[in-house]
């Protein structure tokens, strides 16, 4: 399977629409680090590097990519997403308390993905407040229920992007890495 045709999740500041432009500005590289990974949109659309590191401070988002990295877990996530109806009741059951209490990483990923895809606006993953349930699609013809129903088809493309995880402090200690983060860290 090729590159994903849409983001792993709808995420505020996700850069999905800008990713091709951003990738075009990148120099040739062997190491790529997403220090503030979010939806990983640039990582998912760029050519693979020898070493790729994804990191984000929010463990619920990182959990999605960890689940997708394991073939058996990714398949189970696909199955659960396919069985999840696009319903307001499901949207409303996804709260920060529920996510924090959920011990099953696959279920936590399913809940987070549903919230991201069914909320109005990309800020829907901010569980501190509700942006509302997305009923209508864009003027271009996309319909939220159809987007959710077909999202599991993208799992293999997202999974094949090859995401590795490192603590942020380890990322910044790579001697050959030049990034805004390393410039800030080393003044």
Language-model regions: role of each:
Residues 1-17, 25, 74-187:
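SAM-dependent nucleic-acid methyltransferase catalytic core
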Residues 3-49:
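An N-terminal domain-cap segment
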Residues 29-85:
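Conserved S-adenosyl-L-methionine
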């Amino acid at each position: 399977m090729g590159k994903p045709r849409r983001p792993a999740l709808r995420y505020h500041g996700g850069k999905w629409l800008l990713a091709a432009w951003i990738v075009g500005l990148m120099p040739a590289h062997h190491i790529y680090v997403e220090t503030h990974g979010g939806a990983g949109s640039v990582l998912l659309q760029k050519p693979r590097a020898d070493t790729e590191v994804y990191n984000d401070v929010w463990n619920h988002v990182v959990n999605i990519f960890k689940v997708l990295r394991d073939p058996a877990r990714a398949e189970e996530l696909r199955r659960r997403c396919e069985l999840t109806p696009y319903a307001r009741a499901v949207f409303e059951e996804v709260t920060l308390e529920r996510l924090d209490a959920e011990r099953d990483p696959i279920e936590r990923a399913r809940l987070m993905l549903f919230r991201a895809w069914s909320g109005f606006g990309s800020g829907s993953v901010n569980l501190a407040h509700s942006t509302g349930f997305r009923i209508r699609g864009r003027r271009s013809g996309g319909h939220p229920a159809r987007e959710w129903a077909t999202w599991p088809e993208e799992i293999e493309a997202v999974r094949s992007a090859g995401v590795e995880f490192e603590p942020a402090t380890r990322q910044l200690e790579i001697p050959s890495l030049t990034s805004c983060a390393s410039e800030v860290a080393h003044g």
